[in-house]
């Protein structure tokens, strides 16, 4: 029994020893494997870290650094100032920003506003829901870049070169043959552009467009300049109460966002006043905004009817406008296009364009100005819900590389099919724009159009509320998984029924268009000339005589003509739209008219 017990004990000890050796072996092998693979794991981690850094470098953030204000109008067009958004500035106005952030954090109870009240629509708060509770002055916005090519003027950044070119192009009426003789130097550059296929980048640019509506702390110190820096050689009289600064008078405003490495700069140009944050309103720069709207987007100085006050004196007679006058009005120093050129010049004084990627963006009027500025200097431009600016581009004779396709212009227009201003249908006697005093008669855009078809996809109806940048960001862009596809604009022509003339002896006016409204039932006179040979024995000579025969012919018509058919063109209307005078475009005032009473 004792031997048997010892045998079982030895057997148990051997099994324990075997298990022990097995465990030790496994642990040893595991340690060896970990030790061997440590180097490869470290290399993989380093590679992953590099890839993450590349991703973060591709997706940087933008933050508001400067605000530029350029005065316009006859009084303040020489006024130009800059406000730097520094940490000291943010600390100085911390109570205001705290209050503003609380206001933006609260749910907005939007009052019921009729879609035909444009002024109240503009006065609504338009800060996007996605950024509620964030300070517009310190918000950081992500973005991504993409590689692209740009063809632009070599001397575009030379002082006064662009202005001299535009003056020369205006003097020669934009004649392409003459412009080609001066042999402009075009260069091809590899540049960085916003990645318009990335939804976050598009939202960022739209937010910058919305940020341009933001008002700054409006206290007495700010009114008297305090933080503003004078630019240029003109310093207004600070004791003159008629000269206001910043937001308080007519002018153009640009909010400048800069990346952390100072390599990317985005200029957000303010659109039509009224669509601001709490504390804003249509009384900021609304009057001058409307003047520039009507100058840029109407056929002839907002000449809709004799009841309208035109913004310039270029109208001559029914559907006839002076082209030279229009071009000079757009280039005046107190208008927005000249102001945006000078604003860009002052931005490039801080951020040299040779070493900085400069983009421009804006909403509505600001988007159109961004497109004009981008085409002038060859900058990438992204516009949101902008009216058609092709007509203004041609009137300004902006430089365009010969043969450059639209997809290489680096201009993108984002819009939706339910916005009547973007679609160019907010016109006519009963339209909301006309009732509010806006002559939005243009439809055609330059560059690429990126259109969200919300009418088909969401069943929306055309409504001015869909023009707001807040609606565009929260209810359109963020509700789609991808950004809208961008495509070249279809063939388009604005103001086809207008005749633009130039009072220059060396310049031929546009020929009169054939009148399709002439009544086909009127009798016409046709003159037939025949040569008849006749023989004469007088003096033995033969002579030929020409007989002119005039006959009256009438076209064959199944309908019996009346004695006095009414003309087909309305030349004069009452204020409520009733036509009181009929005639033709080429008729005199006292001939071929029909009065309806």
Swiss-Prot record:
One of its GO terms (cellular component) is membrane. Residues 519-554 have a biased composition (Low complexity). Pfam families: Lipase_3 (PF01764). Residues 37-597 are lumenal. One of its GO terms (biological process) is piecemeal microautophagy of the nucleus. It catalyses: a triacylglycerol + H2O = a diacylglycerol + a fatty acid + H(+). It is an enzyme of class 3 (hydrolase). CDD domains: Lipase_3. SUPFAM superfamilies: alpha/beta-Hydrolases (SSF53474). Residues 1-15 are cytoplasmic. Belongs to the AB hydrolase superfamily. Lipase family. Binds to both phosphatidylinositol (PI) and phosphatidylinositol 3,5-bisphosphate (PIP2). This is Putative lipase ATG15. It comes from Candida albicans (strain SC5314 / ATCC MYA-2876) (Yeast).
